[in-house]
């Protein structure tokens, strides 16, 4: 199969094959949970992946895939979300041949369970999997194979980060994940998060390394800040998390 999960050990794939076209990227927004969904495709093979689809906008995503003449191989989740129900189960029904993907450490059901170091191939491109736990134990960051862009889920947000006070979160673990798995990428690597609540769409590794008010702190100071956030519980957590544990392979009831 052209879209297979491969192990990459110490080598970097090229984003381009010869003079081939660059990766196709579309960033989409779901306003209720302020979630970004990302569509990436190979303009030559027409193979594509979706990152962090939302149930309420899965029909929109499927329509865009069809309009662009793409073949969706994977609906991928960066982690088991607490603020929305994933659209991956519905997309499997809407676009036959699509498979759901999530980290094995998430404990959620899916067609494919990935681990740190795995690569999701679509045409000439690949998304490298970097385990980035802390927000949840199963969080991963997906890095395009030329290291030009990273899809950080809730681990790293623009000038912020995911909370660590539920779903077995750990502030110290998150701090080390970001510094060791994301901040080690090139400074001009684009950062695309799973959420933004201020109208921002993209950042860079260098910006976040130098300007992120939480992650420029020491680890000890970061843990203290995270412990004092005292945020309200996500409105959808009580039904979103149970649903997301199985919606990788099931279409949610209407």
Swiss-Prot record:
Reactions catalysed, as given in the entry: S-sulfanylglutathione + O2 + H2O = sulfite + glutathione + 2 H(+)
Gene Ontology terms describing biological process: glutathione metabolic process; hydrogen sulfide metabolic process
Pfam short name (any one): Lactamase_B
Localization (cell): Cytoplasm; Nucleus; Mitochondrion matrix
UniProt modified residues of type Phosphoserine: 14, 19
Keywords: Acetylation, Cytoplasm, Dioxygenase, Iron, Metal-binding, Mitochondrion, Nucleus, Oxidoreductase, Phosphoprotein, Transit peptide
EC number from the UniProt entry: 1.13.11.18
Residues with PTM N6-succinyllysine: 32
Cofactor: record remark: Binds 1 Fe(2+) ion per subunit.
InterPro entries: Metallo-B-lactamas, Mito_Persulfide_Diox, POD-like_MBL-fold, RibonucZ/Hydroxyglut_hydro
Reported regulation of activity: Glutathione increases enzyme activity.
Disulphide bond pairs: none
Keyword check for Phosphoprotein: yes
Molecular-function GO terms, alphabetical: iron ion binding; sulfur dioxygenase activity
PTM-bearing positions, type N6-acetyllysine: 32, 66
UniProt main location, coarse: cytoplasm
Residues involved in Fe cation binding: 79, 135, 154
Feature: transit peptide: 1-7
GO cellular component: mitochondrial matrix; mitochondrion; nucleus
Cofactor: Fe(2+)
Function in brief: Sulfur dioxygenase that plays an essential role in hydrogen sulfide catabolism in the mitochondrial matrix. Hydrogen sulfide (H(2)S) is first oxidized by SQRDL, giving rise to cysteine persulfide residues. ETHE1 consumes molecular oxygen to catalyze the oxidation of the persulfide, once it has been transferred to a thiophilic acceptor, such as glutathione (R-SSH).
Entry's family note: Belongs to the metallo-beta-lactamase superfamily. Glyoxalase II family.
Subunit and interaction comment: Homodimer. Monomer. Interacts with TST. May interact with RELA.
Name under which the protein is recorded: Persulfide dioxygenase ETHE1, mitochondrial
């Amino acid at each position: 199969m052209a879209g297979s999960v491969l192990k990459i050990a110490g080598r970097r794939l090229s984003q381009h094959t010869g003079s081939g076209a660059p990766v196709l990227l579309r960033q989409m927004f779901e306003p209720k949970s302020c979630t970004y969904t990302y569509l990436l495709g190979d303009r030559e093979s027409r193979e594509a992946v979706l990152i962090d689809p939302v149930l309420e906008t899965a029909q929109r995503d499927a329509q865009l895939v069809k309009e662009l003449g793409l073949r969706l191989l994977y609906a991928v989740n960066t982690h088991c979300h607490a603020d929305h129900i994933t659209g991956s189960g519905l997309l499997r029904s809407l676009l036959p041949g699509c498979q759901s993907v999530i980290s094995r450490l998430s404990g959620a059901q899916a067609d494919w369970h990935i681990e740190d170091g795995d690569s999701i191939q679509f045409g000439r491109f690949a998304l490298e999997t970097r385990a980035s736990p802390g927000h949840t134990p199963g969080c991963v960051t997906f890095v395009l194979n030329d290291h030009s862009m990273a899809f950080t889920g809730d681990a790293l947000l623009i000038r912020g980060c995911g909370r660590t006070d539920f779903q077995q979160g750990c502030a110290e673990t998150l701090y080390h994940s970001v510094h060791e798995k994301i901040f080690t990428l090139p400074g001009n690597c684009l950062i695309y998060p799973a959420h933004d609540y201020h109208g921002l769409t993209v950042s860079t590794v260098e910006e976040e390394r130098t300007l992120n008010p939480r992650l420029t702190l020491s680890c000890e100071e970061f843990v203290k800040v995270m412990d004092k956030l005292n945020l309200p519980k996500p409105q959808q957590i009580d039904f979103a998390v149970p649903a997301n544990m199985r919606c990788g392979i099931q279409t949610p009831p209407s």
